[in-house]
Design a protein with these regions (language model features):
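Active-site phosphate-binding/coordination module
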Residues: 32-120
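Substrate-recognition "cap/lid" segment bordering the active-site pocket of phosphatases
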Residues: 76, 83-104, 156-186
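Substrate-recognition/cap helix-loop segment adjacent to the acidic, metal-dependent catalytic center
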Residues: 58-76, 134-154
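Non-catalytic pre-domain segments flanking phosphatase-related domains
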Residues: 1-17, 21-26, 36, 179-180, ...
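Mg2+-dependent phosphoryl-transfer enzymes with acidic/Ser/Thr/Gly-rich catalytic loops
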Residues: 8, 167, 172-242
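Charged, glycine-interspersed solvent-exposed loop segments at helix/strand-loop junctions
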Residues: 115-132, 153-165
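Conserved Rossmann-like nucleotide-cofactor binding loop
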Residues: 20, 60, 197
Length: 242
C-alpha cells in the first residue's frame, strides 16, 4: 500500500479522472469505465465521511455520465464544483476566451484531419491525438492567442492536447476550496493524478501537509491504481486502515 502521511481513515482523497482512474483513449468519449469503479468510489467516499472528490478537467456533466454515483466532483479544472455528493453546483463567475480565439483554433483544427476542438464553458481544448503532427504548431498558435490576455487565461499542456482555461482557477484552487469546508476540512489531503494539469492539485495537497502523488511513479498504471483503491476500500470497511 502507498504510505499515507496519516491514518488513511483521516485522509481526504482527490482523484484525477483521465489517465488516473481510467486509461487514456483515442477520443474523450471513448474512455472505458470499469463497471465496478463507480460503486467502489461511492463506498470509499462513505468510509471517508464524504471526503473524496474527483478533480478533473472534464465538465461536471461528463463526470456524472461516466461516474453516476453521489460523490463530490470538481470539473473544468476547478471552474465548477459540487462539494457535497448531492449538493448544489458552485461556479465562480469567469470570463470566456474571445470568440476570435475559438474561431482561429477551429480553423487550425480543420486543416489537420483528426484534430478537433472540445468546447468548455469558459475555454476550449485543441485535441491532436489523431493528428500528432499538429501538436507543435497548435501550441504556438494558442500560446500567441493567450498572450493577448495573459492575466485572464492560461494555456495548459495536456495529453496530446492544449487547453485554454481561465487563469483564476485550477485543480489547486479546487483542492484549496474543498479543504476549507466540511467534510474535507481537518483531514489530510492526498491528491493523485498523472498529468501536468494535476500538478497544481498535488502542490496544494503537499503544502497542506498531505501527499501529491504522480500516478506513474506511485502506482504505474490506472489498473494498478484501481487495485490499490480496492484494497484501501477493503481495509477501511474492516476498520484495519485507521
Ligand atoms: O483532468 P482529467 O480528468 O485528467 O481530464 C483531462 C482532459 O481529459 C480528456 O482528454 C484527455 O483524455 C482523452 C480520453 O482518454 C484523450 O483522448 C485525450 O487525448 C486527452 O487529452 C478530456 O477530453 C479533457 O476535457 C480533459 O480536460
Amino acid at each position: 500500500m502507498q504510505d499515507f502521511p496519516t491514518a488513511p481513515a483521516q485522509a481526504a482523497l482527490f482523484l484525477d479522472f483521465d489517465g488516473t482512474l481510467v486509461e487514456i483513449a483515442e477520443r474523450p468519449d471513448a474512455v472505458v469505465v470499469p463497471p465496478d469503479l463507480p460503486s467502489l468510489l461511492e463506498r470509499l467516499s462513505a468510509h471517508l465521511g464524504g471526503a473524496l472528490a474527483i478533480v478533473s478537467g472534464r465538465p461536471l456533466l461528463e463526470l456524472d455520465h461516466f461516474l453516476p454515483v453521489a460523490i463530490a466532483k470538481a470539473g473544468n479544472h476547478g471552474a465548477v464544483l459540487r462539494p457535497l455528493p448531492d449538493g448544489p453546483v458552485e461556479q465562480p463567475a469567469l470570463a470566456s476566451p474571445p470568440a476570435a480565439w475559438r474561431a482561429k483554433a477551429g480553423a487550425f483544427a480543420e486543416a489537420f484531419p483528426g484534430a478537433f476542438i472540445e468546447d468548455k464553458a469558459h475555454g476550449f481544448v485543441l485535441h491532436f491525438r489523431q493528428a500528432p503532427e499538429a501538436g507543435p504548431e497548435a501550441g504556438m498558435l494558442l500560446t500567441s492567442l493567450v498572450s493577448e490576455a495573459p492575466d485572464d487565461f492560461a494555456l495548459m499542456p495536456a495529453h496530446m492536447a492544449w487547453e485554454v482555461t481561465p487563469r483564476s482557477v485550477s485543480k489547486g484552487t479546487a483542492v484549496a476550496y474543498l479543504m476549507s469546508r466540511s467534510p474535507f476540512a481537518g483531514r489530510v489531503p492526498v491528491f493523485i493524478g498523472d498529468d501536468v494539469t494535476d500538478e497544481a492539485g498535488m502542490a496544494v495537497a503537499r503544502e497542506a501537509g498531505g501527499l501529491g502523488l504522480r500516478l506513474q511513479d506511485s502506482f504505474g498504471t490506472p489498473g494498478r491504481f484501481r487495485d490499490w483503491l480496492a484494497v484501501l476500500e477493503g481495509q477501511l470497511a474492516r476498520g484495519v486502515a485507521a
